[in-house]
């Protein structure tokens, strides 16, 4: 449907029989109203034309060929001449054949039929509203027993067969004989209701507001009772309270949407447009038909049989009518959801019929395959791997994917720079992977964001924008901090990449969807770009110190058992064999690590600036050891640092005890804070 703001949308729900008739009925120019399908036939076996009033009738659903009626006469569609747009001989309008994609029909059911989705699917909406067990309702719908009409507004379920006690032997055969007489038909029609008719009568008598009020009162009474001391009784009360909550929510939904409960019982069965259930001619004079056509034919056959029985009801036994009503109910159930009641219906080749539910639900259904999961151009898909060198707003795009996604832009760049005279030559250069192609691709990608999406998209952070960077390999590289928004990890997850084409889409991607602008959860406001899994493990490994001889190395930097640094005799900084190295700056320490002079976990002493505070308080902490030198200066050794003081107790310098991993981690944090401050100052 299309609302008042011209937005196309789809609404699924219950409709009234009046609305179904309005969708299907159409008035022909001669005043005749058509729309009801009464015959189970499709095409005539000789003429190969649709049967009149059948499942492919041209009077109901429109012509097969535009402007050509069933007689074969052609009339111009939308011509200015005042020619009749209707064939009086066959009754077919001269309209576009595309009408057969949306023109519906209907089957007028001889008896009401319960919609199996609302009866058998869990939770059962009909059982919830009526507050009846599902098994009893199924027995009533499928005519296993009958329902006595309300007496003093107290409806009861009665199993009429087998409910009599034959105290007198003579009545053992006389009472069952009454159920086969003509007098019982009058009694049955007046006092007994069965099948979907009984369900519809009960649903029509419901007052939804009274249901809400009574359910709320009962829920409060159960809540005030408290625990009974019996676990089984407490669980029973809890289940009853949950049921009352579901019942109130269901009743409120019916009131809010202006839907009547009795609409869950069908009296008119919609017939899909023919183009949605086609019959295709193949070689050899054979044809392939949709399974839904066969299921519709079965419904019409049984419905017509029931109509014939009801027109001759005086001579038809009531048992036969009830049996035929059950067959109609089962045929409609199979059409809507084959196999929901047990064994599915199969064809002659033992193949299960594909019902309406099978057509629309699941991964290969109409919605997910055609509407939601539709394949689009300018998109790709690949496995994600971690990109440790990427910024938060960047993603690594493989060359093979990037050249396909941005191929049209690269072709335009080659032609504009006069490197190719036409599209064919440009494509040949791309196939040959000439160096100029990658240069133009780099220029194109610099100003063009891409969208990354991981299914299922459960919230808005399931799709975010990134600045693409060309990488080698065939996997998409991703910054690990954005994984939580996608609910992704690097164990084989796949992600789709899309290219926004219009300027509006690119602007929206840059302003609203870039990953560095989505740092907080839209649901609760907590930070969502936090280190998890691989990053936490990496930070642990990075900041993990050397555990070998930790006590001796911790308090005595001159411990000769510090064997890991023995090969550093020839370095350009002050160091003596058997001692932990001293560094004047973090650059010197990282340089020694790159030259493999020390490893990631080697403990070292790093000179600290006097204007920078040490985390621990020097004034309050007692030194572990004090070492004096010959010139009067001395070293105060603490837990994680050492202070060099002069003779007058003035502080000359401070050394902190750390590792290369800690230094790298500190520098990363420092650069991130400085970058944020610079960007903030530019923004203000």
From Swiss-Prot:
Residue ranges of the TM segments: none
EC number of this enzyme: 2.7.7.6
Reactions this protein catalyses: RNA(n) + a ribonucleoside 5'-triphosphate = RNA(n+1) + diphosphate
Name this polypeptide is given: DNA-directed RNA polymerase subunit beta'
Disulfide bonds: none
Cofactor: Mg(2+); Zn(2+)
Subunit structure: In plastids the minimal PEP RNA polymerase catalytic core is composed of four subunits: alpha, beta, beta', and beta''. When a (nuclear-encoded) sigma factor is associated with the core the holoenzyme is formed, which can initiate transcription.
SMART domains: RPOLA_N
GO function term, MF aspect, one: zinc ion binding
Keyword annotations: Chloroplast, DNA-directed RNA polymerase, Magnesium, Metal-binding, Nucleotidyltransferase, Plastid, Transcription, Transferase, Zinc
Location(s) in or outside the cell: Plastid, Chloroplast
Cofactor detail note: Binds 1 Mg(2+) ion per subunit.
Broad class of enzyme this protein falls into: transferase
Sequence positions that bind Mg(2+): 489, 491, 493
Gene Ontology annotations for the cellular component aspect, listed alphabetically: chloroplast; DNA-directed RNA polymerase complex; mitochondrion
